[in-house]
Design a protein with these regions (language model features):
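A short beta-turn/loop motif at secondary-structure boundaries
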Residues: 9-13, 60-63, 247-251
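An alpha-helical support segment within catalytic cores of ATP-dependent transferases
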Residues: 1, 107, 118-119, 126-127, ...
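ATP-binding glycine-rich phosphate-binding loop
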Residues: 4-20
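Active-site activation/catalytic loop segments of kinase-like enzymes and analogous catalytic loops
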Residues: 133-143, 204-238, 252-269, 281-289
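ATP-binding pocket architecture of kinase catalytic cores
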Residues: 19-130, 168
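ATP/Mg2+ or Mg2+-diphosphate-binding catalytic cores
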Residues: 260-316
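Active-site acidic catalytic loop and adjacent metal/ATP-binding pocket
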Residues: 15-22, 27, 102-103, 161-208, ...
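Acidic, serine/threonine- and proline-rich low-complexity regulatory regions
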Residues: 238-248
């Protein structure tokens, strides 16, 4: 297949490229890390569909040629719909119901189109802390004084470890890991979940934090609180104090990670469009740590080394 004859679609933060074919299908191409971007990508989609959560279905695979063909879900992302919608509550309630459904998934092993089994990994302590390290390795060295880098890294790393230790909820559920409205498509009156290749089993509050404190779509505190309340009402059996505790910790760790990822995308991959979202990621971090004693040490350290001016800097 000559990809030059197909329409290249807007991509995501991965090494995948998406093309629209004339056969109501999307060509997903990935030469780099194709195991994750093609094989695992389809395996998780298969897992979601098997558990009655809508996801793109595989039409054909050409793994040896670095691409697969999946169904075309159109261009109507939930992100676009929410930007225009006056009835955000109804949309978010539907999303929360899908999240509750996703968190009931028990499947751990999936047979891939290569006939081997893919085991969905656990979101371990080391994985979460390694992700927080992205903030320290990519963002921090570019914004603070050279002679302060080493000690600040050590200080923040210890704080991240202590925050992880404060997580309360032990139950492990299916976690999409990028559960935000840019990764949801509205197709044939149904919401489809996309970009699911990083799925793991982990803390029940993680995907909720991804959805509510999404850096791509700015929402009011009122909307954020309403979404949280929707989830809380549908999950009344969960210890609500523990849920709030874990939600806030994971939101902060996630948005610190995102600042690191967006910096890496710009510096390493030349994807500078992600830099403009860093100030809002900071805003979300500030909001979550402001009145929570769990974050007192983090708040003081961030205020010492990362000025308000730096956080709101318009990156180019």
């Amino acid at each position: 297949m000559n990809l030059n004859n197909l329409k290249l679609l807007a991509g995501d933060a991965s090494f995948r490229k998406f093309y629209r074919s004339s056969k109501n299908s999307i060509i997903v191409f990935s030469k780099k890390n194709k195991y994750k971007n093609l094989l695992v990508y389809d395996a998780i989609n298969k897992c979601l569909n098997k558990n009655r959560v809508k996801a793109p279905k595989l039409k054909k695979q050409f793994y040896n040629k670095n691409y697969i063909e999946i169904e075309d879900l159109g261009n109507n992302s939930l992100f676009k719909i929410l930007k225009k919608s006056k009835n955000k509550n109804k949309i978010y309630l539907n999303v929360i119901k899908i999240l509750k459904f996703i968190q009931k998934i028990k499947t751990r092993s999936i047979k891939t189109f290569k006939k081997n089994n893919y085991i969905i990994p656990q979101y371990t302590k080391s994985k979460i802390l390694n992700e927080s390290q992205l903030f320290l390795d990519w963002y921090l060295p570019r914004v603070i004084k050279k002679n302060e880098i080493k000690k600040t890294k050590i200080q923040l790393k210890n704080i991240f470890v202590n925050l992880y230790k404060k997580l309360k909820l032990k139950k492990s559920v299916f976690v999409h890991r990028d559960f935000h409205v840019s990764n949801m498509m509205y197709h044939k009156n149904k919401i489809y979940i996309i970009d699911s290749q990083d799925a793991v089993y982990g803390n029940i509050a993680y995907d909720l934090a991804s959805l509510i404190d999404d850096v791509r779509l700015k929402t009011s505190i009122n909307i954020k609180n309403k979404i949280y309340k929707m989830y809380s009402n549908l999950n009344s059996s969960i210890n609500q104090t523990h849920l709030k505790n874990d939600f806030e910790i994971l939101s902060v760790l996630r948005n610190l990670k995102i600042i690191g990822i967006f910096t890496r995308l710009a510096v390493r991959d030349g994807k500078k469009q992600y830099l403009k979202m860093i100030p809002y990621a900071w805003k979300m971090i500030e909001y979550r740590i402001e009145n929570n004693l769990n974050f007192l040490e983090l708040k003081n350290t961030l205020n010492k080394y990362f000025s308000k001016k730096l956080r709101t800097k318009k990156w180019r």
